[in-house]
């Protein structure tokens, strides 16, 4: 989940 806030890592 690299969308912005949850997949920021």
From Swiss-Prot:
Coiled coil: none
Modified-residue entries (Arginine amide), positions: 9
One GO biological process term: neuropeptide signaling pathway
Any one of the GO CC terms: extracellular region
Record's keyword terms, sorted: Amidation, Neuropeptide, Secreted
Organism domain of life: Eukaryota
Cellular compartments annotated: Secreted
Protein task: Myoactive peptide. Increases the amplitude and frequency of spontaneous contractions and tonus of hindgut muscle.
Record protein name field: Tachykinin-related peptide 2
Organism annotation: Rhodnius prolixus (Triatomid bug)
């Amino acid at each position: 989940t690299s969308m912005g806030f949850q997949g920021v890592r």
